[in-house]
C-alpha cells in the first residue's frame, strides 16, 4: 500500500473548495485557521470562539474570515458546512458532537475525546468513506502511532512507552485540563495500531526557557532487536510522516538488550506557531490533510455555509 | 506551643535513591516503625508517584496497589499519603488510591505550573479526599510568583499548599521570604515545606519555614532521597521541638524507625557529595548528575563547570539534551547559538 503517494497526490490544484468552520481560538485553532487559509481546497467561512477579545478571533479576522464569539451556537446557526474542526476540549467536543451529527457535516476533532474514528494519516489513511467524526487522537499520538505501528508490524514488541514533552506556553487551558484524556486516548491509539496491550503514556509540560521543541520518546521492549533493522523501519515511517508534517525527524534510535529507544522531534512549519510548537503543528497538519482529501473526494455534495 | 504536622515521604521520595526498588517487606517494616513513632502522615509510592513506574524513570519493584495496601495495613495511627504528577498518573490512579484508603494526596507541579493540577485537585475535592498541591523546583520562581501559584492551587481545591526545594538550593532567608509570601497569599490554608540537603541546610531551612508560618514540614528517615537526600526526619523533629513547635512524635520510637530505615531501606545514608553540592549551588535538577559526569568525562570538561552553565541556562528536568550542548560548548567544539 503506497500511502505516501496517496497522501501527496491528494492536494488538488483546482476543484470545488470545501466550506469550513473552526470552533476554538486557542493556539491550535489559530494555527488551523492559518493552515486552512493556505490550503487551496478549503474555504474558511466561520471561526467561532467564546471570548470576543481573543487574539485568535482577531487573527482570523485579519485573514478575512468571518468570526463570532457565540461558539457552537453560531456554527449551528450558520450550518451546513462541509467540514467543522473542533479545537476546543474533550468535554466540549462530547457536547458538540450530538449537535453536529444530524447536520451530515464531516467533523474533525482535535481533542482527545475518543468519540470519533481515530486517524493517523500514514497508518489509517485519512478516513473511511462513511466516517462523519474523525478524531486526531493527540499530539503524542500523531507523533508515536506511525512508529509504533511500523515497529510492531516488523518485530515482536511486548511493551511500549511513549513519553512526550510539550513547551508550557503552547499548552493551553484545555490541554492542561485534558491530561487524563490525553493519556487515555494516546494509550488507546498506541494499543489499537500496534496490537501491544501493555503500554504506558506520559506527558511532560515543560516551562524551560528557551522552550523545548516538541519531543516524543518511544521505549519499546523488543526481544533480540537488531539496531540497523529497527533504524530502517523507523526511518521509513518518519519519511512517510514528513509527507504532511515536514518538521518530523528521528533524533536518535538505539537498540540494546531488548530495549529500543527512539527519540522523535517535531519542529513546527507554520505561519503563526513558534518552531518549538511541533505538537500543534503535527496534529493540525494531519487534520487539514483529512479535510483536503475529503474536499477532493469525487462525488462529494458541497454544502454552503454562511457567506463571508 | 505551636503545632506542625510532620509529613514523611521516606517510602516515596527515598525510592529515587534505590531506583524505585523498595520491596513490600521493607515498606511494611518502615511503615510500622513510623506508625509506632506517631508520625502523622506516611507517604508511599514510586518516586514519581502514582502510575509513574516506567522505563523512562525506573520500574517499581511493586505495583501501586500492592504498595498502598501493604502500608495501609501497617498503619494504625498514622495517616496514609501518596503522590502524583499530572501527566504521569491519572484520575483513575487517584480513584484506585482512594479505594485503598489513602488519606492525603500530594499533587506535584513545576513551580510556575499550578494550572496543571487544576483537574486533579478538583477531582480529589469532589471525591472528598484531602489534597495538597506542592510547587517543585521552587527556587526557579520568585516569592511573588510562588504566592500567586499557591493561591491558584487553593482556588482549584488544594487544602494545603507549599514548596519543594527540589534542587536543595535555598538558604534560610530564601525560605523565609517564600513561605512568608505564600502564607500571606493563602491565609488560613496550611503551608508545606519540603527540603533537600545539597548544601547541608535542609533542617535549618525547615525551621525557617516553620518560623515563617509553614504548618506541614516534610522529612525522610536518615534523609533517604536522591543525591544529597532530603531533610533528615529524626534531626528535624527534635530541632523543631526545641524551636517551639510541637510535632506529637515519640522521639525514641522515631530514632528506632530511622535506625531501621538505615539498616533495611538503603545501602548507605545519603550525604552531600561533591556533585550534589555543585548541583545545589547551581540550582540544577540533581537527576542530571550521571549524564553530566558521563558526557563531561568523555569530552574532558570539568563537570562542575557544566552544572554551573546549566544553572545559568535554567535547565529543568527533561532537558537532558541541553547537557550535550553545554559540554560541546565548554570543550570548544563550536558554541551553539541558541543559548538563553
Swiss-Prot record, chain A:
Keywords: Aromatic hydrocarbons catabolism, NAD, Oxidoreductase. The keyword RNA-binding does not apply. NAD(+) binds at residues 25-28, 279. The active site is at residue 139. It comes from the Bacteria. One of its GO terms (molecular function) is acetaldehyde dehydrogenase (acetylating) activity. One of its GO terms (biological process) is catabolic process. This is Acetaldehyde dehydrogenase. The lineage of its organism: Bacteria, Bacillati, Actinomycetota, Actinomycetes, Kitasatosporales.
Swiss-Prot record, chain B:
GO terms for biological process: catabolic process; L-leucine biosynthetic process. It is an enzyme of class 4 (lyase). Keywords: Aromatic hydrocarbons catabolism, Lyase, Manganese, Metal-binding. Its EC number is 4.1.3.39. Pfam families: DmpG_comm (PF07836), HMGL-like (PF00682). GO terms for molecular function: 2-isopropylmalate synthase activity; 4-hydroxy-2-oxovalerate aldolase activity; manganese ion binding. CDD domains: DRE_TIM_HOA. The record marks 12 as: Transition state stabilizer. PROSITE patterns: PYR_CT (PS50991). Coiled coil: none annotated. InterPro entries: 2-IPM_HCS-like (IPR050073), 4OH_2_O-val_aldolase (IPR017629), Aldolase_TIM (IPR013785), DmpG_comm (IPR012425), DRE_TIM_HOA (IPR035685), PYR_CT (IPR000891). Mn(2+) binds at residues 13, 194, 196. The keyword Coiled coil does not apply. Belongs to the 4-hydroxy-2-oxovalerate aldolase family. HAMAP family: HOA. PANTHER family: 2-ISOPROPYLMALATE SYNTHASE 1, CHLOROPLASTIC-RELATED, HOMOCITRATE SYNTHASE-RELATED. This is 4-hydroxy-2-oxovalerate aldolase. It comes from Streptomyces griseus subsp. griseus (strain JCM 4626 / CBS 651.72 / NBRC 13350 / KCC S-0626 / ISP 5235).
Amino acid at each position: 500500500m503506497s500511502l505516501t503517494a496517496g497522501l501527496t497526490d491528494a492536494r488538488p490544484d483546482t476543484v470545488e473548495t470545501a466550506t469550513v468552520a473552526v470552533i476554538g481560538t486557542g493556539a491550535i485553532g489559530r494555527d488551523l485557521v492559518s493552515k486552512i487559509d493556505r490550503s487551496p481546497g478549503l474555504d474558511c467561512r466561520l471561526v467561532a470562539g467564546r471570548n470576543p477579545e481573543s487574539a485568535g478571533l482577531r487573527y482570523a479576522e485579519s485573514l478575512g474570515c468571518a468570526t463570532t464569539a457565540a461558539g457552537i451556537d453560531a456554527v449551528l446557526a450558520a450550518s451546513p458546512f462541509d467540514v467543522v474542526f473542533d479545537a476546543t476540549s474533550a468535554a466540549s467536543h462530547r457536547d458538540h458532537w450530538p449537535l453536529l451529527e444530524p447536520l451530515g457535516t464531516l467533523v474533525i476533532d482535535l481533542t482527545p475525546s475518543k468519540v470519533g474514528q481515530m486517524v493517523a494519516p500514514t497508518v489509517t489513511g485519512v478516513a473511511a468513506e462513511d466516517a462523519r467524526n474523525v478524531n486526531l487522537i493527540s499530539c503524542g499520538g500523531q507523533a508515536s502511532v506511525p512508529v509504533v505501528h511500523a515497529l510492531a508490524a516488523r518485530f515482536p514488541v511486548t511493551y511500549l512507552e511513549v513519553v512526550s514533552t510539550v513547551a508550557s506556553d503552547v499548552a493551553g487551558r484545555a490541554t492542561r485540563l485534558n491530561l487524563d484524556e490525553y493519556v487515555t486516548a494516546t494509550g488507546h491509539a498506541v494499543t489499537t495500531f500496534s496490537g501491544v496491550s501493555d503500554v504506558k503514556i506520559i506527558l511532560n509540560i515543560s516551562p524551560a526557557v528557551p522552550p523545548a521543541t516538541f519531543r516524543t520518546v518511544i521505549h519499546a521492549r523488543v526481544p533480540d532487536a537488531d539496531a540497523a533493522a529497527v533504524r530502517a523501519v523507523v526511518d521509513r515511517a518518519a519519511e512517510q510522516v514528513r509527507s504532511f508534517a515536514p518538521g518530523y525527524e528521528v533524533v536518535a534510535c538505539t537498540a540494546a538488550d531488548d530495549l529500543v529507544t527512539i527519540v522523535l522531534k517535531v519542529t513546527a512549519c507554520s505561519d503563526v506557531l513558534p518552531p518549538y510548537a511541533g505538537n500543534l503543528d503535527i496534529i493540525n497538519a494531519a487534520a487539514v490533510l483529512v479535510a483536503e482529501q475529503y474536499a477532493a473526494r469525487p462525488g462529494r455534495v458541497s454544502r454552503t455555509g454562511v457567506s463571508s | 506551643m505551636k503545632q506542625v504536622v510532620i509529613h514523611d515521604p521516606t517510602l516515596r521520595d527515598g525510592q529515587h535513591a534505590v531506583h524505585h526498588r523498595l520491596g513490600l517487606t521493607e515498606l511494611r517494616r518502615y511503615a510500622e516503625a513510623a506508625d509506632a513513632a506517631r508520625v502523622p502522615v506516611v507517604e508511599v509510592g514510586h518516586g514519581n508517584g502514582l502510575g509513574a513506574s516506567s522505563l523512562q524513570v525506573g520500574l517499581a519493584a511493586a505495583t501501586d496497589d500492592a504498595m498502598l495496601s501493604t502500608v495501609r495495613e501497617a498503619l494504625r495511627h498514622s495517616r496514609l499519603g501518596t503522590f502524583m504528577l499530572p501527566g504521569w498518573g491519572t484520575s483513575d490512579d487517584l480513584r484506585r488510591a482512594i479505594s485503598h484508603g489513602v488519606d492525603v494526596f500530594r499533587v506535584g507541579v513545576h513551580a510556575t505550573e499550578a494550572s496543571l493540577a487544576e483537574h486533579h485537585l478538583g477531582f480529589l475535592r469532589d471525591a472528598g479526599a484531602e489534597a495538597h498541591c506542592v510547587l517543585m523546583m521552587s527556587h526557579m520562581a520568585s516569592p511573588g510568583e510562588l504566592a500567586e501559584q499557591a493561591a491558584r492551587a487553593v482556588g482549584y481545591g488544594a487544602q494545603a499548599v507549599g514548596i519543594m526545594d527540589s534542587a536543595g538550593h535555598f538558604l534560610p532567608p530564601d525560605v523565609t521570604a517564600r513561605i512568608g509570601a505564600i502564607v500571606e497569599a493563602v491565609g488560613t490554608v496550611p503551608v508545606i515545606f519540603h527540603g533537600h540537603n545539597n548544601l547541608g541546610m535542609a533542617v535549618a531551612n525547615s525551621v525557617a519555614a516553620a518560623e515563617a508560618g509553614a504548618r506541614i514540614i516534610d522529612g525522610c528517615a536518615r534523609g533517604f532521597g536522591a543525591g544529597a537526600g532530603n531533610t533528615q526526619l529524626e534531626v528535624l523533629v527534635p530541632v523543631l521541638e526545641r524551636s517551639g513547635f510541637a510535632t506529637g512524635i515519640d522521639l525514641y520510637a522515631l530514632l528506632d524507625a530511622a535506625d531501621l530505615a538505615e539498616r533495611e531501606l538503603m545501602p548507605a545514608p545519603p550525604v552531600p557529595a561533591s556533585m550534589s553540592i555543585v548541583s545545589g549551588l547551581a540550582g540544577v535538577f540533581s537527576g542530571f548528575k550521571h549524564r553530566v559526569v558521563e558526557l563531561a568525562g568523555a569530552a574532558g570538561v570539568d563537570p562542575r563547570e557544566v552544572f554551573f552553565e546549566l544553572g545559568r541556562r535554567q535547565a529543568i528536568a527533561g532537558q537532558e539534551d541541553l547537557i550535550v550542548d553545554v559540554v560541546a560548548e565548554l570543550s570548544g567544539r563550536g558554541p551553539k547559538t541558541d543559548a538563553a
